[in-house]
């Protein structure tokens, strides 16, 4: 089951959170945000590497400028969004959920 919250989504990797869902959220982010830099980071979950690659590649295809920060704590992306000229950020994390889970958390200048 995909869990939706105010800041993003979480789910079982390759079941609830697969390539189709990741691409769908990349397009939603693109449609919502104005032009500008999007920061992307992830936690150390093994699945994060593939998810971040899909997300970044899709956003680049849509013409977005991406600053990839690698493995960082969630507050790092939030800080970068709110202290730079960025218009948004994405952190790939499932916080306290089991390792089989991952998620897409958004940090937007409008929130």
Residue map of PLM features:
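Conserved small/polar residues in nucleotide/adenosyl-binding loops
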Residues: 2, 109-111
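Ferredoxin-reductase
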Residues: 36-107
């Amino acid at each position: 089951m995909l869990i939706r919250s105010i800041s993003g989504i979480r789910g079982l990797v390759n079941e609830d959170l697969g390539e189709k869902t990741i691409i769908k959220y990349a397009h939603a982010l693109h449609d919502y945000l104005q032009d500008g830099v999007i920061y992307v980071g992830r936690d150390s979950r093994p699945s994060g590497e593939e998810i971040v690659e899909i997300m970044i590649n899709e956003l680049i295809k849509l013409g977005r400028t991406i600053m990839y920060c690698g493995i960082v704590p969630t507050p790092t992306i939030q800080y970068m969004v709110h202290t730079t000229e960025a218009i948004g950020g994405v952190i790939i994390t499932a916080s306290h959920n089991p390792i089989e889970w991952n998620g897409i958390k958004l940090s937007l200048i409008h929130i």
